[in-house]
Design a protein with these regions (language model features):
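Acidic, polar low-complexity linker/tail segments
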Residues: 1-19
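Glycine-rich, flexible N-terminal cofactor/catalytic loop recognition
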Residues: 35
Length: 142
């Protein structure tokens, strides 16, 4: 599937977080798409997925929800990191590249992660499923 938005042109192919040895989750982004955000934490714990949950905390407006998500991480025994100086999708991509690299992925709904990621895959959550995103070369006709 091809997607064009204000962030660029992207090629999306179906993929699954289970194809990666570790995933870095942009919590605010993914949780916002769920009717019950707690499902994100409960299902990850139940499935035993190796995940790092990256929580936006870089602006005071994030702090209340960030605390709620940190509490859920603790309740389910999950690895959570606060992103205190940049958006979580950028920090997740940075952490993924630094700690894991190839064979790992960032899970988000934000296409900025595609630009920020180096060696890690970026899976965009869209239409209830995950899609591996690659930015298309803007010099190619399209």
């Amino acid at each position: 599937m091809k997607v064009k938005n204000r962030k660029g042109r992207f090629d999306l192919r179906p993929d699954s977080p289970s194809n990666y040895r570790r995933v870095y989750v942009d919590v605010f982004s993914i949780a916002a798409s769920l009717s019950q955000p707690e499902e994100l934490f409960a299902s990850a714990a139940e499935a035993g997925i190796r995940a790092v949950f990256v929580i936006d905390a870089w602006h005071e407006t994030h702090l209340g929800l960030a605390q709620r998500y940190l509490d859920l991480c603790r309740r389910y025994g999950l690895d959570c990191r606060l992103s205190e100086s940049k958006p979580a999708e950028a920090y997740a991509a940075e952490l993924c590249d630094a700690e894991c690299g190839e064979g790992c992925a960032v899970l988000t709904r934000d296409y900025d992660a595609v630009k920020a990621a180096g060696r890690c895959a970026v899976l965009i959550f869209r239409q209830g499923r995950f899609w591996r995103a690659a930015q298309e070369d803007l010099s190619e006709p399209g």
